[in-house]
Amino acid sequence: MDALELKNIISDGLLSFPVTDFDQNGDFNKSSYAKRLEWLAPYGASALFAAGGTGEFFSLTGNEYSEVIKTAVDICKGSVPIIAGAGGPTRQAIEQAKEAERLGAHGILLMPHYLTEASQEGLIEHVKQVCNSVDFGVIFYNRSVSRLNLDSIQKLTEMCPNLIGFKDSSGQIDMMTAVTQTIGDRLSYLGGLPTAEVFAAPYKALGCPVYSSAVFNFIPKTAMEFYNALRSDDFETTNRLIKDFFLPLIKIRDRKSGYAVSMIKAGAKIVGHDAGPVRPPLSDLTQADYEDLAALIATLGPQ
């Protein structure tokens, strides 16, 4: 699959970001992860992002990273494209991008570099070097200390033919408006804010109709119901789900830092697809928070 083909795929549909399964010792659980992907695949996500933020990319060792990507590629071959997370320092991101391409992934999501702040010139060079190291498609993740301005994005689209996507987690509506209006269909645009469903309608209005759904990990039926309603401008359904489910979910998520990932793993366990614990420095939900989440999920019915 070339970069343009991947761009067309991620321009439509719901994007799945599966959690990464660990056993009770905190080691990667390959068989459980494989079963998870087999369970989620038939629900109709347009692409699957292995070892992304929700998949605890930041806590995987080099060998584990390779094993996660290889498992995803092997299980989903012929059914759904695999996009791998890759990031951190430039040379590490290049190594991971090359490894993902070698293992048969169809592209990467370029995660933020580590810790340090960087100039726009430095970010341009970082993205350019990663793009130049591979042939497949690269999606830039605009968040945290790794944010490009409009001028930098324009330069990179000219320098890097395989830069195909821009995932935004900044929430800066004016910036996204400028990007989509100026860059146009040269890139595909992905909404990437936590609990992205709440922001999906305004992002769609900006020309960014696609988003990453973390809740697809435990309520795939409802996640697809929401996406299809959004796509058809069924505001009665989207507003009902936001009010009755997503806003209460955010209240649970915001009780502790790191719950944006921990809550997703807890949800998977509640619906019978246990992915094991999160790794430090994240912490699992408290029992009270777990019970509140279980009660909220129960209101949706079977998935």
Swiss-Prot record:
Query: What HAMAP family does this protein's entry cite?
Result: KDGDH (MF_00694)
State the pathway, as annotated in the record.
Answer: Carbohydrate acid metabolism; D-glucarate degradation; 2,5-dioxopentanoate from D-glucarate: step 2/2
Could you tell me one molecular function GO term of this UniProt entry?
5-dehydro-4-deoxyglucarate dehydratase activity
Q: Does the keyword Phosphoprotein apply?
A: no
Catalytic activity reads:
5-dehydro-4-deoxy-D-glucarate + H(+) = 2,5-dioxopentanoate + CO2 + H2O
Question: What's the protein called, per UniProt?
Answer: Probable 5-dehydro-4-deoxyglucarate dehydratase
Biological processes per GO annotation: D-glucarate catabolic process
Enzyme Commission number(s) of this protein: 4.2.1.41
The family assignment reads: Belongs to the DapA family.
Q: Which UniProt keywords apply?
A: Lyase
